[in-house]
Each structure stands twice: as structure tokens, then as C-alpha cells.
Amino acid sequence: MVYSDTKTSKKIKKYKINIMKKKLNIFQIPLKGIHLIEASAGTGKTSTIAFLYLRLLLGLEKNKENIRKLSVKEILVVTFTNAAKEELYIRIKKSIKELHLSCIKKKSKDPIFQSFLTKIKNFDEAIHILEDAKININNAAIYTIHGFCQDVLENNTLISNREIIENESFLYLQATQDFWRYFFYNLPKKIIKIIYEEYRSPEDLLREIKPILKVNSSINFKKKFDKKETLITFHEKIINKINIFKQKWLNYNLIILKIINQLKVNKKIYSNFNILKWKKKITEWAESETKNYKMPICLKYFSETSIEKNIKNYNFKKHIFFEEIDKILKKNFSLKNIILFYAIKNIPKFVKREKEKKLLLGFNDLLKILLKNIKKEESLREIIIKQYPVALIDEFQDTNIQQYQIFNTLYKNKKTALFLVGDPKQSIYSFRGADIFSYLHAKFKIKNYYYLDTNWRSSKNICKAINYLFSKNKNPFYFKNIPFEPILSSSKNLNMKFKIKEKNQTAISFFFQKKEEVNIEEYRDWIAKQCANEISYWLTCSKKGEAIISDGSQERILTEKDIVILVRNRTEAQIIKESLKKVNILSKYSSPYESVFKTFDALELLSILKSILDPTDINLLKKSILTHILNKIAFQKIKENSKTKISHFLIQKLYEYNDKWKTIGIFYTIKTMILEYQKYANNFEMYKNQQRNINFLHIAELLQEKSQNCYKENSLMRWFEKKILEKNNISENEYIKNFAESKIIRIITIHKSKGLEYPIVWIPFIVDFNVSKSYFYHEKKTLKIFFDNNKSSETLKKSDEERLAEDLRFLYVALTRSIYHCSIGISYLVKKRKKNKKSSDIHKSSLGYIIQNGKCMNYKELLYELKILNKKLYIEVKYQAMNCKSLTIKKDDLYILSQPQFLLKEIKLYSQITSFTKIKQENKHFNNIQYNNIESYFFKEKDKKKTIHNFPHGNKAGIFIHYILKTIKFNNTFNIDWFYTILKKYEFSEKWAKTLMFWINNILNFKINNLNITLSSLKKTQYIKELEFFLPIKNTLYCEDLNQIIQSIDLISSISQKIFFNPVIGILKGFIDLVFIFNKKYYILDYKCNYLGNNDNCYSSKNIKKEIIKNRYDIQYQLYTLALHQYLKKKVKQYHYKTHFGGVFYLFLRGINVKDSIFYILPDYLLIKKLTKLILQKK
């Protein structure tokens, strides 16, 4: 879509008068007013922001000595992603540190810092300011856009008791389902059948409109419907039009058949037989009842268009009905228009209603609320400006209209400063809501316009090649308003070279598939092979010392870590991975900002470490044995000694690791495991798993570091679990230390590569494209967003123009990642083969548009353009990669460890156990379970009288009893054979069967306090077993806050010692053994299999109370109550705690023969309210 209309051109010319485009001098730009800084790729955008930040800290204004110096809390820095926020924080922190050191030394090797020194008049003051900034950098106002909005709104109490949600997908699905029910359920069946042909489910409808619903600006419709227009009335209108046409057919068909018979038509198509057959079909349709909008396919042969194509004499006698047929065939009758109109109008309303009902806010709601309030409240604007007199907005090209309006409204005052830094050529995030048109709109309103013109990243020839490619076309980014300015190369990069066998390689190599009419599958296979072969050739040369990278001052040999392949998605990545695999090159598809805690290795290590902390927990043992490390060690033990019992061996091994952990620390414990694994692994396994070992050791380092501040091992595991669950907040030291640094080729999406740089880049699939199927576009004159629910071909064309424009920006981002060299694939690509097709489709792709100047070209014309490119010293066109043998990997053993080598047949396990709270676990000493107890689990028991008191105690026994109570039906009678089976399954002696049967029977018939009920009397509809819950900890939970609340209200807590744990935030997960309803009240019942002594008298109220205090079961019942309270609020109409919640029972199962073996408490409502506020309500 090119802005060529008169009104827009005049508007742009008007703005151009006001815009003074200047090259940026970091020390000359005023620190007041609104400034736009356009920074092309590699020109130092992040450094520019950091240097402006330093100027603001020191108050270095041109010719002004009295400008106020700002603190780190007063300089607002806003970007759009957490990764960018982290990068800015690191760069600003580093710059403060470097300038501080330079001020102390009064000299610097860096020319920028040296320039700062010449402008500082009072070094003592500057050192003090920078030292203060270093100390307070953690309080710097560096935000994502949504983080900034949330902070302002919460600090000014404009939102309260609202949960902020990042992902609103579930709300939109629910709203679409509500819309579906509201609009469709009461329709006649005949209309529902027609709708079903368009959309089979609410999910289908949501899939089509989701891109439109993501747009923050208001949407305009090409066709609007009157409020009185319903699906029924619209349907009836369509049916009426079809019926009118049917009647016309019955009236005129003989006349038009007579006309056709008189014409010299193509008799191969219009034979008498065909004409009569078509007439019969159409007449039968015309005489039948109209139930849908389908037309007979053969009707097209009677259209004016079809007849004109198939006659020799075009001046045939026309009848008006021929034209009528053409018109009705073009109508494409459908209910989609009206459905989409009402869906787009109403679904956001349903979402809004649901958010208000559930007290939820999405990220975009934060923008809307803040914009609304700052527009109407001058006092709020003043508060924000007073707090942040200067704002630096990073990645401004990724803005949308609301984000721009917020900052424009705040910083219109001349006394403030707003710096907008970005590059419209790199706006590639429309799928996330970024709107390049908002940027263009803002650009035209800003008078102070600066640019950066020196590329500090790439070699001179890379800069030349990119300048040439994007200067070939007058509008290289399709829109006239996004021009391309040739970039200069930094003087330090003038001698950068990539050499193979002492020959300098060109900056860009195009690999062209010399074949006409190539389809996408053929092209993908071919270019993937070329990519793999070329990289194989480079690496082979590298092994011989013949592949060299030189920065002008020193040379080094090319390694795998220097090479990156850029793709669009996982599908393209997989194609490349397979090709690389064929030539024995290892590769990895990953995110550049991926945390080591998000790897599968972190989950495996967590399973192992948990098992080390509790070797007797069979459930943990099951998970840990399925990990690669323990599985290999155990499997090798079987090979060495087939008589070894795996369960015994593993438990002993886990206890060994446990001792090491306590004596030499977690890092060396993990390292010992890896060394033991490597002792049994063959060379190829070790080669294959080097990345995993790097990850394990990396996590071990982080855990060792964290362990210095952790009170207990379980506390460390809680932190470890939290890091695995965290979505954001990734620290730089957590980024994966890729084995790719030495041995693996990285494959990264172009989206994720933005902002990064790589020595050598391959872009194999950039010539591919997907024509837009969206009916969503920006109107040329007003830049308003339109949705064409009429679905015209003109709209599709406009939408595809916008797609191509973004693809061109996508290409620019990909090309500008390279430092020394970039290889690109290209082909004479034909998406859909057509007869007599004289041109390919690549002009519709970004690369084709650039090379062919936006023109349609045939094969010879494309070859000619490539020959012109090939004449440039910095560009080369290749037709095939260098032939090279596959790289060899030494394999002492071809066996590949692809999965655990044996499944536990020996250890029979169940699937679930009751979870204790993690907070309690942090205070539990490991030595509560003694090694001697293991014998009662795995070895033959001595013959003695069987009672419930001497039934094996410990973790395994508790799990076993819980499993029985979870599995059985409360009101059934038992067969002793079942007990024999289950005892055998869990490796207990079958001699316990009779005792166990009586014990379980007594439990089920035990009277629960004053309720006068038993478990066996409960109906199935009265209870839920193993109710799982997840409670989000919205605020960092500190032990001091929890102790203060529970000890001030709860009697048991008040006489218990304070609990200690590290600050936590994340998700609290648990299982409630039993929830039951009686007399309209809901109760929690938790089974306790604790051993208090060898007779019934040991289970007195006094002893039970001591056991509850000792194990801090008070915190358990408080959190369980909180969880059930939240659950019932959603499930019970007009729910209130005091009316509907009955309390908590702890049933001590070994004391079931005495009345006192049950403990009851009803937690105070005030306690639950305070816990809700502390844990669940975002502060």
C-alpha cells in the first residue's frame, strides 16, 4: 500500500516542512522537548540510550550549567519486552560503572567516555553522583510498557483488588462460547445447519477473528448492519433473493437455451447432451424448496462470462438474464458477514464483562485505564511528570496508538523531555500488537528528528551490500514514508574479512536454484542441502586451519559458534536440522534468551535432588530412576551383577549422594553424579550429551551460589522449583551456556534474533512467503483500521501489500544480523502452477521484491538481475555449494542413549500421594527418616503379632494407607483377597491382610466428632477425594509476614515456634485428602498415619496436639482452608465462609480405636481474610 493519493501527499509535505532531520550528536541534543531518534540496525541504539542516561544523571546540557541533575529513580526508561528491559539495565549499569572509573582515573580509552570527561567540570561531584547511581541502580525506573502502566495505576490507587493477567486467551474462548450460545442456540435448525458449514465450533470462529481482536485501536467496518438486522432476517433476505432468481430461471431458461443453440459455441463444452443435463439439474433445484445458499455448479455455464469465453462471435444477442446469472454467482451468499460483524462487536464486550465479574485486567486494559485517566486528570499528569521529568522510550517502532498517546499526553510540556528511539525498518512484531502506522503517525508530528548513520556491527562490505540491495528500489520498504538511508561503516570495521583457503569471501552469497518453476517443497529440500553442504565445507576447512575470521588486528579460526541459521519457525528449523544431521553436523533450535531452568535437564535434576533428600519416597524414586543419569548408572549395575536388587542399590546410592550434599555441597554432589555417569557412558553418548552436562553443571553452580543464603536443603529445592515455574524475571547468569559455543550450529527465528549479531549468517528460506488471507487493513488517507466483512478482492490486495511491507522489514532485520558474511537462498519459485505461466511468484516475497524492483519477471529476466548482482565485488551468486564429505564423529560405540533403558518392573508404584506444603518441608529435618527403616520396606519382616501400632511406619506406609483410602468406595464391603493383592503390589507381607482389613473397616465406621456421621455413611455425591489445588502466590511471601498473621489469630500457631523459609513467589500446590458436605456445610478431612506410640493410650488429645505443633500442621490446615475457601467461592452460589464452611478434621489413623484420635478446628474467618490478602491479592 503506497501513499500516493493527493490528500495524504499534501499532509506528508506539510509535516516535512516541520521536520528537521539531523545527524545525532549525543552531547548536542537538548535535554528538553520531544525528540525522535531513528537508529538503523547496528548503529548503537542501546548505547545511545545509555549515554543519554549518563548526561541526565550528570546534568550535562549544552551551554547550561544549572540544569537539574536527575537520580536513577527520576529517569524513566521504557521498552517492550522483558529481554530488552534486562539488556538496557545491564548496559546502563555497565556505562555508569565505566564512566565512574574514568572519572576517578580522569582518563579513558573509549572516545565517548573521554568526551564525557572533557565536559565534566566538577569531578568530585560527578564521582559522587555516579557512585550513588551505582548503589541505587536496582531502583532504576526501567520498565516494560505494561509494567510502567501497572506501577503508576497501583501507586495512585486507580486499580485495586484486580488480578493482572498476561494471557487472555481463556477469556476470549469463554466469550466466544458465550456469544455462540447467545446468538446461535435459539435459531431455527435450518439456519444452524448453514452456520455449521461455516464454523463447526466456537474455536473455529475465534481462530478467524483473533487477529482482529488483538488490535488496540477501534475497528471500522466496510459494511455495517442495522441493529434491527438479525441472523434470521438476514437469512430470509438471502433466501428471498435466491427464490426470485429461481423463478426467473423457470421463466427464462427456454429463451436463453434457444439463444445458446443459435450461437457458434464450443461444442466440446456446450454439447446438446451437456446443455440438457445442466438445464435439468438447475430446473430441479429451482423447483425445490430453498434450504441453503448453494447454487448448482453447472449454472456458471449459462453466465455471460462463460459464454463469451466459448463463442467465436462476441456480438451475440444478449438477454438480461445472462447478466443476472453473473451477478448471483458473484454474490457468494453467506452468513459470515453478519456473524463476523456481531462477533467482533460483541465478543470484546463479553470479555470486558467477564473481567469485571472476576476482577481481572489484561495488559492492554492497563494502557486504556492510564490513558483515560491522564487525559482527564491534570493532577495525575503532574504527579507522573514530577516523578519522571524525563522519559526514554526504546524500540519505539513497536508502539501502538495508545502507547504513543500516553507519552505524548504526558510529555507535551516544554519543561520535560521525551526521547523516542527506534527504527521503523525493524518493525516486525505486528502479531504482538505493534503498529507501524502508529509510528508513522507520531513521526509526522515530531519536529526534532535525529538519525544515527554509522554501523558499528558489520564489516564494510556487509554495509555496502545492504546499501546496494535496499537502494535498488525507490520504495524498498514499500511505504514511501519508510525510506532507506545508506549507512556508513565504522572505521574500526574496514578490514573485517572472512577467508576460506586464503580467499576473501564476499559479504553476501546468493544460492540460486537454476531451474524453472520450482515449487516450495522442491526449493526447501534443495536449499537445506546447499546450506548443510556449505557449512560442512566451511567446518572442514576450519579443521585444517583454512577458514579464518579477521577483524583487522587479529585472526582466528572459524568455529561452529560463529555460524547461525535464521528461520521463520520451528518447521523451517526442523528441515535444516535434518539436512545438517545427514552431514553429521549437530544443531540446536533455541531462543537466545532461554533460561537453563526452562530445560528438560532442570526437571530431571530436580527429580534426582528431591529423591536424594528423601531416598525412601517411592514416588520420587520412580521419577528419578527415569532420568538419564540415574538410569544409566542403575542399568550398568544390572549388567555388572544381575543379582543386584535395583531398589536396594538406588536407595543406597541416593544416601551416598545425600551425605556428599551435606558434607561437600550441592555443586560437587552433582559433579560426582555426572562423573559417575560418564564412567559408564561410551564416547558417542558423551559427545551427544555434552550440552546436557553443561546444563547440569550450570544449574549446579547456580544452586551452590543460592545455597549460601538458604536455611535448609528443602528451602533450596523450593527456590529451584520456583525458578522452573517462573515465566519472566530471567537473569543474565541463567542464560543457557550453549555447547553451541564450540560444537553446535545454532538455529534461531528471525524474530528472536532481532537486536543480536552473529559473525556468519545463513538465511535459507527468506524467498518463501504466505499471501495474506486477512480482510483487515489500514485505509490510505486516514490510516484508520478497517475490516472488510464483505471480503472483496480489493481488500485482500491491500492486506497483502501490508504483509509484503512487513516481510521487507523482516528481510532487513535478518540481513543486518551478520558481521562478516551472509548466505541467502533464492529460486524461481512458483507457488501455484498454472498453464502458460510466464513469471514466478517471488516478486511477492521480500527478497524477490528487492531484486526484481517489485516487478513480475520471467526466468531469463531474473537471471539477468542476478548477473548484475554478481558483478558487485561484495556480492556473489552461486548455483551449488562446495562438495564436501560429511564431517566425521568418532564413535567407539554406535549405541545411542535415546531413552531410559529399563522401566521399573521391580518397584511397583502408585500414581499420586497427598502433598504436604512446601513451607513445612523447609523446616523438616532430613534425618526424621532413618536408614534402618528401609529394611521394613524392602526386606522380609520378623514374625510377630500384627497390630495397627506395629504396622511399618514411615513415609512408605503412610503413602500406602492413603492410597487405599483414595481407591476404595466408602460404603462397600471388602474382600480379603484384594488386600492380599495390594500388599503384594506394594511389597508388604501378605500376613498383614487381616489386620489391614479390620483397620480400614474401623476407619470407615469411626464417628466423626459431634456430626454423628461416618465415612461409610457418606454418599458418593457428598465427597471429593484428593482435591488438587493451585494457589498463585501473587506477592513475595516472607516468613515474618506469615508468622505475624497466624500467631496473632490462631491458637495452635501462637504456641508454636516461628517458621522460617526463604521469600517465595510462584504457585502453591497441594492435595486435600477428603472434602465432604454435611448439613449444607463443607468440611476438610486429612488422614494422618503418624506413629505416636505402641498402644491406643498414646493417641490422646494432648499427644495429638503436640504432634500438630511439632509438624506445624496448623499451617497445613490454614492453607487447605484458604484453598477450599477460594474453590467454594467460585462453585457455591451466595457462598459465605461463616455459613458454608464447617471446619477441618485431622484423623490419626493409628489411634482409630479411641475417640480422641480426631482433631477438629474451624479457622477464624479473620485469619482466612488476612491470608487471602497476604498471598492471593496483588499488592
From Swiss-Prot:
ATP binds at residues 39-46. Belongs to the helicase family. UvrD subfamily. This is RecBCD enzyme subunit RecB. In the RecBCD complex, RecB has a slow 3'-5' helicase, an exonuclease activity and loads RecA onto ssDNA, RecD has a fast 5'-3' helicase activity, while RecC stimulates the ATPase and processivity of the RecB helicase and contributes to recognition of the Chi site. The active site is at 1086 (for nuclease activity). Mg(2+) binds at residues 962, 1073, 1086. InterPro entries: DNA_helicase_UvrD-like_C (IPR014017), DNA_helicase_UvrD/REP (IPR000212), P-loop_NTPase (IPR027417), PDDEXK-like_dom_sf (IPR011604), RecB (IPR004586), Restrct_endonuc-II-like (IPR011335), UvrD-like_ATP-bd (IPR014016). Pfam families: UvrD-helicase, UvrD_C. Its EC number is 3.1.11.5, 5.6.2.4. Keywords: ATP-binding, DNA damage, DNA repair, DNA-binding, Exonuclease, Helicase, Hydrolase, Isomerase, Magnesium, Metal-binding, Nuclease, Nucleotide-binding. Its cofactor is Mg(2+). A helicase/nuclease that prepares dsDNA breaks (DSB) for recombinational DNA repair. Binds to DSBs and unwinds DNA via a highly rapid and processive ATP-dependent bidirectional helicase activity. Unwinds dsDNA until it encounters a Chi (crossover hotspot instigator) sequence from the 3' direction. Cuts ssDNA a few nucleotides 3' to the Chi site. The properties and activities of the enzyme are changed at Chi. The Chi-altered holoenzyme produces a long 3'-ssDNA overhang and facilitates RecA-binding to the ssDNA for homologous DNA recombination and repair. GO terms for cellular component: cytosol; exodeoxyribonuclease V complex. Heterotrimer of RecB, RecC and RecD. All subunits contribute to DNA-binding. Interacts with RecA. Residues 485-755 form the UvrD-like helicase C-terminal domain. The N-terminal DNA-binding domain is a ssDNA-dependent ATPase and has ATP-dependent 3'-5' helicase function. This domain interacts with RecC. It catalyses: Exonucleolytic cleavage (in the presence of ATP) in either 5'- to 3'- or 3'- to 5'-direction to yield 5'-phosphooligonucleotides; Couples ATP hydrolysis with the unwinding of duplex DNA by translocating in the 3'-5' direction; ATP + H2O = ADP + phosphate + H(+). The keyword Phosphoprotein does not apply. Residues 18-459 form the UvrD-like helicase ATP-binding domain. The keyword Protein biosynthesis does not apply. CDD domains: RecB_C-like.
